[in-house]
């Protein structure tokens, strides 16, 4: 049955609409580790851009936090495997407390709700699925292989991202390809 997550795949299957690059899945390196079920809370890479560092269980830095997402995620997975752990640690200690509370209020508050004060202690983080660059195959006007069906945004694969999307590019992609779809539609 179709669901809210991945429903485009269910629709695609039931109508034989072509799929492209189902293996193009972006993993975000830092989501808050929690034993609670449900979606993970994303810890923005801008926190690492401000100076937060990744630490292993011994409190040692193990990678350059400013590398591309896939490289940082791979380093985290490697460290977790080496330590037989289900997370690594992200320390915001290098960032001034006022900067944390003013620039990252949602992260600060959510971590407090989970029992972590990011101004006083590192938080457990783990990579998680973040964005799907594959999807329903479309042309440059967002037209699918099914007559009169268009797709734009994360549900479609138009090829602009390749296998690793850059941060924030998906918003522009969604707007551009939605406009292209509307411009191509015949409303008569």
Task: Label each residue range with its predicted role.
Residues 1-6, 10-11:
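Single conserved hydrophobic/aromatic residue that forms the stacking wall/gate
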Residues 8, 106-107, 177, 181:
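Short, well-ordered amphipathic alpha-helical segments that serve as non-catalytic structural scaffolds
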Residues 15-18, 148-149, 174-188:
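Internal hydrophobic alpha-helix adjacent to the cofactor/substrate pocket in enzyme cavities
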Residues 15-123, 184:
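An anion/pyrophosphate-binding glycine-rich loop and adjacent beta-alpha core
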Residues 35-40, 160-170:
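Short beta-alpha connecting loops at secondary-structure transitions
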Residues 105-149:
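FAD/FMN-dependent oxidoreductases across multiple families
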Residues 143-166:
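Short FAD-binding loop at a beta-strand-to-alpha-helix junction that anchors the flavin cofactor
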């Amino acid at each position: 049955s179709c669901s809210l997550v991945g429903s485009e795949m269910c629709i695609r299957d039931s109508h034989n609409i072509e799929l492209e690059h189902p293996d193009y899945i972006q993993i975000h390196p830092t989501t808050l580790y929690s034993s609670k079920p449900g979606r993970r809370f994303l810890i923005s890479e801008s926190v690492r851009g401000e100076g937060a560092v990744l630490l292993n269980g011994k409190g040692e830095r193990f990678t350059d936090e400013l590398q591309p997402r896939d490289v940082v995620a791979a380093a985290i997975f490697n460290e977790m495997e080496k330590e037989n752990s289900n997370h690594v640690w992200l320390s915001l200690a290098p960032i001034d407390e006022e900067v944390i509370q003013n620039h990252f209020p949602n992260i600060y508050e959510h971590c407090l709700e989970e029992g972590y004060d990011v101004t006083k202690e590192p938080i457990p983080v783990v990579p998680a699925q973040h964005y799907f660059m594959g999807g329903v195959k479309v042309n440059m006007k967002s037209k699918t292989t099914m007559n009169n069906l268009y797709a734009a945004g994360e549900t479609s694969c138009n090829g602009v991202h390749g296998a690793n999307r850059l941060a924030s590019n998906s918003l522009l992609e969604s707007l551009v390809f939605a406009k292209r779809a509307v411009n191509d539609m015949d409303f008569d």
